[in-house]
Amino acid sequence: MKRETIALHAGYQSEPTTKSAAVPIYQTTSYTFDNTQHGADLFNLDVAGNIYTRIMNPTTAVLEERVARLEGGIAALAVASGMAAITYAVQTLVEAGDNIIATKTLYGGTYNFFAHSLPRQGIEVRFIDPAKPEEIAANTDSRTKLVYCESIGNPAINVVDIPAFAQTAHAQGLPLMVDNTVATPTLFRPIEHGADIVIQSLTKYIGGHGTTIGGAIIDGGKFQWAGNPRFEKTFNQPDPSYHGVNYCEHFGAAAYIARARVVPLRNTGAALSPHSAFLLLQGLETLALRMERHCENALKVAEFLKKHPQVEWVNYPALPDSPYKALIDRDYGGKASGLLSFGIKGGREAGAKFIDALQLFLRLVNIGDAKSLATHPATTTHRQLDDAELAVAGVSPDMVRLSVGIEHIDDLLADLAQALDAAKA
């Protein structure tokens, strides 16, 4: 099936008892066992079925199936937020004393987690230039466990060469983990380009309406955990925390996503609610249609800003003079999603005046909403970073980030024009 069809039909046929055409909301904590042996078999992971909604739920399972198939993976794990997905994706692979490699240009929450929280857990994060995959080898040692990047960075709006990163990571025996939130699987599937694990903040474009927090981890199913000395203890030996299961022996290609479910999710509990899963399924159904308008509007906004005398610079990867245009054309079909950034003449003060003058664009820190959104990253999403960290993350004091929605383009341009005029005063 094509991606547009997967988003509507994968993982569900009408429910056998009620014949419900819509995916039901299974608002339950627990599931009955046929008998004692059935319960034991479920806990041993010997049979398929549901145990407890902290670990799995039938509504959430449909969402997981659809997201996995959209990204071209073999399975997915949906959790309570995008940050929970990032946390669990990393924790599935690391322990105290390990290190990971990550690009410098990351979402502010991710950068803060990597730079400050992981080190307190005994995990070192080695930051590299997102344009230099060769730095992976120079930062790899025997305790390195993964390489992490964003396909399209937020808010730097840089584009990473995923095939080059994958090739270099694999040469070191490392999996490549890619946050694909900004691109979405509608525009780009990292797994098809060599990535092993994909992260989605379902809160953003997939949910699409600013109503629901959620995240997902997608397993590409291609990385060789078996026989890899970096992951001997993690996947190839009995796990005393879960009935002595050997993940590679028991789950084969799905060893990674199985461990993510029964170790970090089971033990720390950032479970997605069934009702949230239902709302995210509604958003997913129209993802392809919305992304067409997001991309169309964002390009027109970028072109408008590029010509405006009050604007110092514009960063949108689909612009002809963007340093990322070649990658967007090669890997994304020429479309660069709905996120862009720009700088206003007058710096931070003018940027604040611009933000305050907006009448249609909403002043908030989410992205991927059907409505257009604006924020000043240096004082919001990246406020916790000092000046040096801001520079490393690619966030300048004058940067304004726009998440361009699906409204009529004439209304969006009119709002931007009047706000830019107000910024001159």
What are these regions (language model features)?
Residues 152, 181-183, 319, 345, ...:
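Active-site beta-loop-alpha junctions enriched in small/polar residues
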Residues 1, 115, 124, 142, ...:
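PLP-dependent enzyme catalytic core of the Aspartate aminotransferase-like
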Residues 7-16, 76-307:
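Conserved PLP-enzyme active-site core in the AAT-like
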Residues 147, 215-217, 314, 340, ...:
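Well-ordered beta-strand positions enriched in small/hydrophobic/aromatic, beta-favoring residues
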Residues 268-271, 275-277, 282, 286, ...:
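Conserved small-domain helix->loop->beta segment predominantly found in fold-type I
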